[in-house]
Amino acid sequence: MGTIGVRLRGRLGSFQRFEDKPKFNLDLNEYSDQRPFGLERLALSSGGMDPSKLKEVLGAQLMALADVPASRAGFAQLFVNGEDYGLYITIEAQDDRWMRRVFDTDEGNLYEGSYSYAVWWPRFNDFGEGRDERFELQEGYDVGHADIAAVSNATLDSFEAGRVTESLAEVVDFPGLQRQLAADQWLGNLDGYGFIVNNYRVWFPPDGGPMRLASWDLDGTLLPDALN
């Protein structure tokens, strides 16, 4: 395998310096036309938020059982310039290849969701006036956040009309949203969408169908305080 792109990942409490044990994003295709094992990108987690190193992998499997779009995860031993960095969790990147596996198409727009701390707030507070550009396009075509704006407008209209479910069901996969919220509760995912509107993606089908949610970064699952 040739040269690859590497950068540190993480924010707030999860970021660590290179001399510690950081998380990484790997771009396997950045400098060479290569796709080892069919992959273009891969995320590596050091398990800094999870000493057991099990939550990401178990969370991915349980999300799949709940029919919630999420990445697959496994384990690897990492060496950097010959130095053993120990056990890492490998996480499937959510890119066009992942879209093809999960949604049966590599088309459509995939955004990284904006972080909107929302404990005790109404859900979907991440969609609203002035918030559309907080969503970062990961895959697809730049449409000036028009697809995000459609959900934001429906959210505002639904609250004003008192018809949240009926209005949002036209632009959001509501059964999928319910599965997402139930799975976050079931798994005690205190760092996920269902609790603090964090660590999620949204995907818009190319045919203009309703938006789908997907989970990301599941090392905050299975927390005992949430499961009691």
Task: List where the protein language model places each region.
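Internal "kinase-insert"/substrate-recognition segments embedded within catalytic cores
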Residues: K23-D33, L44-G47, A66-S71, E83-L187
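Active-site acidic catalytic loop and adjacent metal/ATP-binding pocket
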Residues: L26, E170-D225
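Residues that flank catalytic or metal-binding motifs in active/ligand-binding sites
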Residues: G2, D20-P22, G38-E40, R72-G74, ...
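Conserved glycosyltransferase catalytic-site signature
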Residues: E56-A60, R72-F75, R179, I196-Y200
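Acidic/His/Gly-enriched intrinsically disordered linker/tail segments
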Residues: A118-D132, G209-N228
